Amino acid sequence: MIVPRYYEDLSVLHENTMPARAYFIPASKRMDNLVEHREESDRMQLLNGTWKFQYFNSIYDVQEPFFEKDYDTENFDEIQVPSVWQMAGYDTHQYTNIRYPFPFDPPYVPQDIPCGTYAYTFVYHKDENAPKAFLNFEGVDSCFYVWINGSYV
């Protein structure tokens, strides 16, 4: 395993995140404030699309530094983002109305909980009139780690 075990540390709720705030999308001009129109903002860049993906039966199976800047992802599978890997044929759905899908023993996480690694290449276009940029993930299901150009953020 190549990542810190934050997923078993109850003292770590977030790391390297911005303080909580009201949800809004910045824009250089006045626009409709409905969330359905957020893509119309010239200061929002969606990272939706086809990402490189690897599925593992356990986080302990992740041994390669897939997050390095020049890591070869040619043999990775591809998956649509946003999506749920269970809908793409990886693993099984975890919801159930019968019993909890894995043992409950906080803060410990079973070693056989599946995980996925994602890689995506994009170009960020800096806007001099909006000097701060934020990376926002909406819908990540559990603990996750982010690297940009090989650097942990």
Regions found by a protein language model. Name each.
Residues 2-21, 26-38, 52-56, 84-88, ...:
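Accessory beta-strand-rich segments of carbohydrate-active enzymes
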Residues 37-40, 62:
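Short secondary-structure capping/turn segments at boundaries of alpha-helices and beta-strands
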Residues 39, 43, 67-68, 114:
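Generic detector of ordered secondary-structure context
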Residues 43-54:
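Mature N-terminal segment immediately following signal peptide/propeptide cleavage
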Residues 44-45, 79, 120-122:
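Generic detection of short hydrophobic beta-strand segments and adjacent strand-loop junctions
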Residues 48, 73, 118-119:
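Hydrophobic residues on conserved beta-strands that form the core of alpha/beta folds
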Residues 52-58, 65-94:
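Predominantly extracellular/luminal regions of secreted and cell-surface proteins
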Residues 99-106:
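Surface-exposed acidic, glycine/proline-enriched linker/cap segments
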